[in-house]
């Protein structure tokens, strides 16, 4: 699970998210604050989940159970979309198109091929775009709100770095599926007994070989329930502390739990385990430059010609690079140091500057280079390999802690939003608030 890189901040889409079937008659299934969930919304999502499950070979529960899970998910989505509207959050078309292009690329197809596949599945591409936009809005609201609740102290980072070093498990990743049986903040005895009955039923069915994903779809209150509860790949340290403690010695295929937390009971399954060997040595460059900015009195041609003359004077010995930088450079930060930029990773520079720099040999001076800042004369002084183990470990520890705390806080936050909203479920003679 790469929530940090991709959307601590992370979206989980499939090509078949929205199903557009014509509806002869529509009814209100639930009232959510000042909005509604329609029967057509449930039916559309029901068809989508069934189709996705069929493509993935995933078993699903009976339709009534599946319908209940979908309704709960749509209620949460409705609440968060209302929050997005209140906050004035929008998704620009450019960002939406980029996300759809990424989804297509992840499925190894073009956007045009995606459109054909969506049409072949009986879906409307405009409806699909609208659903993706909603998913992005929901993710934006959740990320913005939950991020504020996550605090990471320096001593936490140091402690995790030490733990990683001692255990040498920093590169081991687990693919986990998760079932959450929720509980209110201060459950009474009846609520506890009801939840435990469900937990015991699930554990019994797992022992008798019932598919974990099917049970997650049927019972779990986790956001990934309709995807069979799969949380993706995570390092042990990225998982909630309660999970990590129970999973340290778990093997592939193991079922762990139930685990009691502040939001309910958790059951986990280890789908797979993998390791890796990331490189944490980086190349740094020591460079200096002379910058000329264009202006009403300095055109591009004049700047380029001026730098060519300066370079000629340096090569002939008429002046040296440092003196020329002090006299001519428009970069006040480095000019006083003779244009010296110090040691740094080349990726921090403007792409045009970086590319020209990395083509130079040690001591070589470039031709005039144009970047977003102006025109440069660049000299590569030296390169070196630097061991960034400590920096990389602290960065990794921060991301692990953030992902872990974000996951914990997101579940609590969504339950709080559900509990504080006005929700009335309309189902025949039955109404629930």
From Swiss-Prot:
- What exactly does this protein do? Chaperone involved in the correct folding and assembly of outer membrane proteins. Recognizes specific patterns of aromatic residues and the orientation of their side chains, which are found more frequently in integral outer membrane proteins. May act in both early periplasmic and late outer membrane-associated steps of protein maturation.
Q: Which GO terms describe its biological process?
A: Gram-negative-bacterium-type cell outer membrane assembly; protein folding; protein stabilization
Q: Which residues form the signal peptide?
A: 1-20
Catalytic activity entry? [protein]-peptidylproline (omega=180) = [protein]-peptidylproline (omega=0)
Task: Identify this protein by name.
Answer: Chaperone SurA
Residues forming the PpiC domain are 171-272, 282-382
Q: Name one Pfam family in it.
A: Rotamase
Name any one GO molecular function.
peptide binding
Keywords attached to this Swiss-Prot or TrEMBL record, sorted alphabetically, are: Chaperone, Isomerase, Periplasm, Repeat, Rotamase, Signal
């Amino acid at each position: 699970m790469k929530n940090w890189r991709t959307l601590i901040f992370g979206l989980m889409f499939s090509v078949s998210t929205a199903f557009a079937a014509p509806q002869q008659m529509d009814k209100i299934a639930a009232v959510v604050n000042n909005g509604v969930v329609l029967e057509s919304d449930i039916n559309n999502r029901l068809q989508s989940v069934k189709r996705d499950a069929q493509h993935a070979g995933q078993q699903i529960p009976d339709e009534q159970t599946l319908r209940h899970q979908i309704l709960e998910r749509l209620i949460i989505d409705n609440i968060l979309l209302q929050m997005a509207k209140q906050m004035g959050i929008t998704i620009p078309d450019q960002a939406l198109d980029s996300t759809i292009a990424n989804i297509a690329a992840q499925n190894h197809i073009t956007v045009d091929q995606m459109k054909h596949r969506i049409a072949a599945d009986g879906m409307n591409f405009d409806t699909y775009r609208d659903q993706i936009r909603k998913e992005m809005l929901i993710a934006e609201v959740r990320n913005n709100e939950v991020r504020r609740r996550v605090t990471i102290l320096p001593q936490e980072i140091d402690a995790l770095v030490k733990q990683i070093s001692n255990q040498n498990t920093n590169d081991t990743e687990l693919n986990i599926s998760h079932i959450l049986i929720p509980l209110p903040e201060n459950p009474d005895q009846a609520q506890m007994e009801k939840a435990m009955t469900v937990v015991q039923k699930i554990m019994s069915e797992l022992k008798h070989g019932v598919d974990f994903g099917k049970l997650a779809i049927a019972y779990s209150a986790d956001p990934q329930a309709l995807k069979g509860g799969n949380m993706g790949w995570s390092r042990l340290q990225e998982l909630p502390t309660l999970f990590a403690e129970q999973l340290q010695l778990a093997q592939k295929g193991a079922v762990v739990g139930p685990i009691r937390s502040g939001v309910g009971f958790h059951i986990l399954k280890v789908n797979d385990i993998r390791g890796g060997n990331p490189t944490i040595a980086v190349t740094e460059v020591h460079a200096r430059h002379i910058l000329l900015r264009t202006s009403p009195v300095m055109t591009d041609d004049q700047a380029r010609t001026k730098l060519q003359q300066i370079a000629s004077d340096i090569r002939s010995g008429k002046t040296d690079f440092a003196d020329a930088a002090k006299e001519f450079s428009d970069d006040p930060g480095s000019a006083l140091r003779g244009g010296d930029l110090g040691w740094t990773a080349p990726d921090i520079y403007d792409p045009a500057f970086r590319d020209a720099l990395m083509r130079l040999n040690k001591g070589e001076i470039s031709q005039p280079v144009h970047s977003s800042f102006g025109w440069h004369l660049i000299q590569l002084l030296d390169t070196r390999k630097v061991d960034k183990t400590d920096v990389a470990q602290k960065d990794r520890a921060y991301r692990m802690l953030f992902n872990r705390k974000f996951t914990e806080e997101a579940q609590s936050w969504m339950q709080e939003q559900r509990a504080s909203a006005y929700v009335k479920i309309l189902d025949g003679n039955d109404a629930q608030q």
